Amino acid sequence: QRQMCIRDSYQAQRGIPGYRQMKIILERRYGLKCNLKRIYRLMRVLGLRSVCRKKKRRYQKKTPAEYTAENILNREFSSDRQNEKCVADITELKYGSGSKAYLSAVLDLYGRNIVAFSLSRRNNTPLVLDTFEQAFQKYPDAKPLLHSDRGVQYTSRSFRKEMKRAGVCQSMSRVGRCLDNAPMEGFWGILKTEMYYLYHFEDYETLRKTICAYIDFYNNDRYQKKLGCMTPAEFIAASAK
């Protein structure tokens, strides 16, 4: 029975789950208790393994910042309520024959959910402004602490003006300290491992649709151990009761 459940779950999620994620799936969906070593062994017997993560160095052009903020978040990634602390970042993706697209996202540290995201062919301030416009439409009264790196998009005068108007306090990573924004970096790693590296995207629209589908899956169907083996949507709903 366990082997059948493992195989079905693996196929249903396109080979994404490793043995740790599979343990949560077996417990949540099938009520099957099994230790990690046994699941690891069963997956090896079945010839099932998750996609291996590829690591890629990121290089950014240094642009004089119009505004910078202190590292107020200071790696305090726990949160007691929704819309208390959010982190944001941009990552580069490719499609076609090397064309570039840029994905901007905001993650809430309470439910570990993606609040808003935006994809563009240009890595500029309008990209992040569009992302936050979506976030404010969902939560018009939210005034979170917002943490980001010191990219030119987040240090621009126009972005600072918009955050000030919305009553949002900015926090920024120290120079060269990517771990200051570890939850966002972690999300990019998950998205690329479980979605981006699995396919070759022929065009921009295919990339956009696949990202939309994956983030919906991430928010509503992907269990997280840090959330008590619940999905972000389940965790937020449970906390509201």
Regions flagged by a language model, labelled:
Residues 1-6:
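Short, small-residue-biased leader/transition segments that mark boundaries at the very start
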Residues 15, 31, 78, 96, ...:
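Conserved, non-catalytic sequence blocks in retroelement Pol enzymes and Pol-derived host proteins
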Residues 19-31:
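DNA-recognition alpha helix
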Residues 32-105, 127-130, 138-143:
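Mobile-element integrase/transposase regions
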Residues 62-63, 148-150, 156-159, 172-192, ...:
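RNase H-like two-metal-ion nuclease catalytic core shared by retroviral integrases
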Residues 108-109, 119-124:
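A short acidic/small-residue loop/turn micro-motif
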Residues 113-114:
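Hydrophobic "anchor" residues
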Residues 164-168, 190-241:
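C-terminal domain-tail junction helix/linker
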